């Protein structure tokens, strides 16, 4: 699930906000939340906000090792769960909101119509039918669309692809290339 977190202890004792850096992640909802936080913190609290580009893995690594950015308003924490728990327990980071987007989830999805028409009820059922999901460049293979480079879900999905031996079962990875490419692949 998504998590919002930042470094602990950023506000000064007199309540003055000062300067903060906020990660502006490379997907639409995170861009929106970062810009909304910027408006609220600048207009409502007099903060000086700098938005810096980010993605889950790179932003977390930078926050963990360098303390920058100060805030990641939407981060897919499941991709960094173990090191995040360690950083929180060592008071380097604090989770401020465990679910900024209620009901958000991460997983592999297929459309309901294809599932129903082909009696696909389990992951094994789907993996056994690459013919239903043709690869855009090689119709003899099933196309398994992964997350863009730099996203934690790309690493997890590629490892699961290997673990389930999907390549041996007629599948080939489709690199979505970007957030927009991933959005465009959804029919």
What would you call each of these model-derived segments?
Residues 34, 52-92, 185:
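Pocket-flanking alpha-helical
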Residues 28-47, 162:
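Short, polar/charged alpha-helical segment
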Residues 31, 35-38, 60, 81, ...:
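Extracytoplasmic/secreted envelope proteins and their assembly/folding machinery
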Residues 92-145:
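A conserved helix-loop-strand patch within extracytoplasmic ligand-binding domains
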Residues 61-62, 69-73, 145-187:
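Ligand-binding pocket segment of bilobal, Venus flytrap-like solute-binding proteins
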Residues 1-6:
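Bacterial N-terminal signal peptides
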Residues 7-13:
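Sec/Tat signal peptide C-region and signal peptidase I cleavage site
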Residues 14-29, 47-52, 141-145:
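Short, well-ordered beta-strand elements
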């Amino acid at each position: 699930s998504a998590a919002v977190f930042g470094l602990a202890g950023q506000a000064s004792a007199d309540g003055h906000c000062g300067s903060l850096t906020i990660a502006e992640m490379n997907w639409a909802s995170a861009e929106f939340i970062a810009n909304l936080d910027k408006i609220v913190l600048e207009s409502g609290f007099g903060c000086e906000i700098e938005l810096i580009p980010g993605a889950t893995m790179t932003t977390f690594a930078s926050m963990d090792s360098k303390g920058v950015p100060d805030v990641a308003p939407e981060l897919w924490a499941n991709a960094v769960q173990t090191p995040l728990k360690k950083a929180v327990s060592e008071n380097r980071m604090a989770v401020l909101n465990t679910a900024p987007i209620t009901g958000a989830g991460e997983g592999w999805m297929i459309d309901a119509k294809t599932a129903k028409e082909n009696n696909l009820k389990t992951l094994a059922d789907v993996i056994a039918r690459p013919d239903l999901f043709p690869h855009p460049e090689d119709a003899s293979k099933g196309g398994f669309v992964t997350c863009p480079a730099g996203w934690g879900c790309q690493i997890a999905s590629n490892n699961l692809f290997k673990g389930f031996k999907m390549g041996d079962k007629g599948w080939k990875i489709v690199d979505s290339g970007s957030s927009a490419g991933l959005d465009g692949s959804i029919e």
